[in-house]
A protein has these predicted regions:
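TPR alpha-solenoid repeat register
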Residues: 46, 80, 121, 156-160
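A conserved position within tetratricopeptide repeats
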Residues: 33-44, 58, 71, 75, ...
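Sec-dependent N-terminal signal peptides
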Residues: 3-13
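Alpha-solenoid repeat scaffolds
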Residues: 43, 77-78, 95-99, 135-136, ...
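Terminal, low-structured helical/coil segments at or just beyond the last alpha-helical repeat
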Residues: 141-179
Length: 179
């Protein structure tokens, strides 16, 4: 009986820090992440909790800097990499020169590899192809079709369908003009 009590006591003591960590609120995990990671450097559960809390915070606040913080903690985090690459792609896409569009296409393509079930990167690839060369119909069309095969929220799906329809109308206009 004494052995069981001792084993139970040892088990309780060794589990106590984990329970204390798990009781931290998400805000504490986000804003005290540096000190928590310093205090518990080998706690992978704590690290994952901090990353999850930061991802949720970044999503709700649309804050790219939080994704960059996550990449410092976990350089291979696919969600943070996806958002960082999409942000880079948006910045390149805003530029008016062709090399900017090629850089945007590259960033969006890389983002698509990190979360391969989302169609949004393919929509933006199509937009970049259209901006790069308004006479290129096949590459944007291929990108829009790929986008529609994957997950899109309703608003983005409507945007893709509208862009695809405008592209097809423009393609028909050019084709009819050159008959």
């Amino acid at each position: 009986m004494k052995k069981i009590l001792i084993i139970t006591f040892i088990f309780y003591i060794t589990c106590a820090p984990v329970n204390n960590i798990s009781n931290h609120s998400k805000d504490e995990l986000i804003f005290k992440s540096d000190s928590l990671m310093s205090a518990f450097p080998n706690d992978s559960d704590l690290l994952q909790s901090i990353i999850s809390a930061k991802i949720e915070f970044a999503r709700h606040n649309d804050d790219i800097s939080i994704y960059k913080e996550i990449l410092i903690i976990d350089p291979k985090n696919p969600i943070a990499l996806y958002h960082a690459l999409m942000n880079a792609g948006f910045n390149y896409h805003k530029k008016d020169y062709k090399n900017g569009q090629w850089d945007a296409i590259e960033s969006f393509s890389k983002a698509a590899t990190y979360i391969d079930t989302l169609g949004e990167p393919y929509y933006w690839i199509g937009q970049a192809y259209e901006k790069k060369d308004e006479m290129d119909f096949e590459l944007p069309l291929e990108s829009y079709n790929k986008s529609l095969e994957l997950y899109l929220n309703q608003e983005m799906r409507e945007k893709v369908i509208l862009s695809k329809q405008k592209l097809l109308n423009r393609k028909k206009t050019y084709k009819d003009f050159w008959k």
